[in-house]
């Protein structure tokens, strides 16, 4: 009698475990997981098993995932094969799915986007030719000041050397100014305190 009860209990527990394994966990249920915060769930639209924007927003709030998608009304988290080029350029990490949701092989730390290499190269070429970054603008503005400091230092050094050798220091200064006539026009608008005034000549003369 004892053995039969033990066998029945074992069979029941095995059945419950098997059903739980087959059914899996309910999709996108649970508290926020810190391991997946600030990552991106990239999705595409399909005609079946879609989620409304309200459901998508709820998933974001519950799981701490940022949804990156095309400009569409419905989002399907099961379709994750297509990723737009502009999205690829802006992503550091991409998350597709998680074991804790009972749906393995959907989330991966960094997907293979080798099939997009040609598109990315073309996009980078067109982007670099059409627009410049703010950092480049800062470098361009700071460059004349740095050049002014360097040239003044070199002029002083040349003046000292020529004075020792018996030559006039003004000759070295004139050589620097003649060799680089455009630098004086670029430096005309910069002052020691960092302010800028529009000169009447040079490449900044068109600025208002």
UniProtKB/Swiss-Prot annotation:
GO terms for cellular component: Golgi apparatus. It is found in: Golgi apparatus. Its main location: Golgi. Residues 124-208 are annotated as: Disordered. Residues 133-170 have a biased composition (Basic and acidic residues). Keywords: Golgi apparatus. This is Uncharacterized Golgi apparatus protein ECU07_0400.
């Amino acid at each position: 009698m004892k053995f039969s009860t033990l066998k029945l209990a074992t069979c029941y527990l095995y059945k419950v475990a098997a059903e739980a394994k087959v059914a899996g966990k309910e999709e996108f249920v649970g508290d926020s997981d810190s391991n997946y915060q600030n990552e991106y769930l990239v999705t595409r639209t399909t005609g079946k098993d879609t989620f409304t924007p309200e459901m998508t927003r709820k998933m974001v709030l519950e799981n701490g995932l940022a949804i990156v998608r095309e400009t569409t009304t419905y989002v399907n988290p099961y379709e994750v094969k297509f990723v737009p080029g502009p999205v690829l350029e802006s992503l550091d990490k991409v998350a597709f799915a998680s074991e804790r949701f009972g749906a393995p092989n959907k989330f991966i730390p960094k997907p293979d986007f080798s099939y997009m290499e040609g598109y990315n190269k073309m996009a980078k070429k067109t982007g670099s030719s059409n627009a410049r970054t703010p950092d480049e603008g800062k470098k361009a503005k700071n460059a004349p000041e740095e050049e002014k400091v360097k040239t003044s230092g070199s002029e002083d050094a040349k003046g000292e050397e020529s004075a020792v050798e018996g030559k006039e220091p003004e000759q070295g200064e004139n050589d620097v100014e003649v060799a680089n006539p455009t630098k004086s026009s670029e430096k005309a608008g910069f002052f020691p305190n960092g302010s800028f005034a529009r000169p009447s000549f040079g490449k900044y003369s068109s600025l208002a």
